[in-house]
């Protein structure tokens, strides 16, 4: 009944992944992002992560695996997903949804911390505002984007972009793969310090 559609979806996902892998720069950027986060942790910094919708879930997933665990039993790493419901509703109501992440960065971000922002379009105003706030605070910025990077293109210290122009879900599939690789590399790098 749906066998052809199922296979077609899997083939398209594989094609997007293969295209991403074929650009050697993407591999280098993943390593650069992992080292940037690890160095922040080693110097007492933390990660603040944010996104909208499915990307918000990915931001929470990333923070959870930093504070909890990925594959290895090890100390928790300092990470916060900007997902507190009372903060989000307060700022949305009082200032506007475009400030929900930047207000949090202004409140708890410090020089040497890392903002990890996800936007499949690269155009999310609240992520753009968070990037601006992070830079003002002297933080480093890692952006995970899609398509052509949108307005976020060129704003981050490290941008990992999935150049897919059809649906956001394909971009998110690569984002979660990258998040898992980042976790693995961060655990490797932090184990050197233990």
From Swiss-Prot:
PROSITE patterns: SIS (PS51464). Gene3D superfamilies: Glucose-6-phosphate isomerase like protein, domain 1. It catalyses: 2 D-sedoheptulose 7-phosphate = D-glycero-alpha-D-manno-heptose 7-phosphate + D-glycero-beta-D-manno-heptose 7-phosphate. One of its GO terms (biological process) is carbohydrate metabolic process. Pfam families: SIS_2. Coiled coil: none annotated. GO terms for cellular component: cytosol. Substrate binds at residues 52-54, 65, 93-94, 119-121, 124, 172. Binds 1 zinc ion per subunit. One of its GO terms (molecular function) is zinc ion binding. CDD domains: SIS_GmhA (cd05006). Zn(2+) binds at residues 61, 65, 172, 180. Belongs to the SIS family. GmhA subfamily. This is Phosphoheptose isomerase. It comes from Haemophilus influenzae (strain ATCC 51907 / DSM 11121 / KW20 / Rd).
């Amino acid at each position: 009944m749906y066998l052809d559609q199922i296979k077609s979806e899997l083939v398209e996902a594989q094609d997007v992944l293969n295209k991403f892998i074929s650009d050697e720069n993407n591999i280098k950027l993943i390593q650069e992002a992992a080292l940037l986060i690890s160095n922040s942790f080693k110097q007492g910094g933390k990660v603040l992560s944010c996104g909208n919708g499915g990307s918000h879930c990915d931001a929470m997933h990333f923070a959870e695996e930093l504070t909890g665990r990925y594959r290895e039993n090890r100390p928790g790493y300092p990470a916060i997903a900007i997902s507190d419901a009372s903060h989000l509703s307060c700022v949305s109501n009082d200032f506007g949804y475009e400030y929900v992440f930047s207000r949090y960065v202004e409140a708890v971000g410090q020089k040497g911390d890392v903002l990890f922002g996800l936007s499949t379009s690269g155009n999310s105003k609240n992520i753009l505002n968070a990037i601006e706030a992070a830079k003002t605070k002297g933080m480093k910025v890692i952006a995970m984007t899609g398509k052509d990077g949108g307005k976020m293109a060129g704003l981050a210290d490290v941008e990992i972009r999935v150049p897919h122009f059809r649906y956001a879900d394909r971009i998110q599939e690569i984002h979660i793969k990258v998040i898992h690789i980042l976790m693995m590399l961060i655990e490797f790098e932090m184990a050197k310090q233990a």
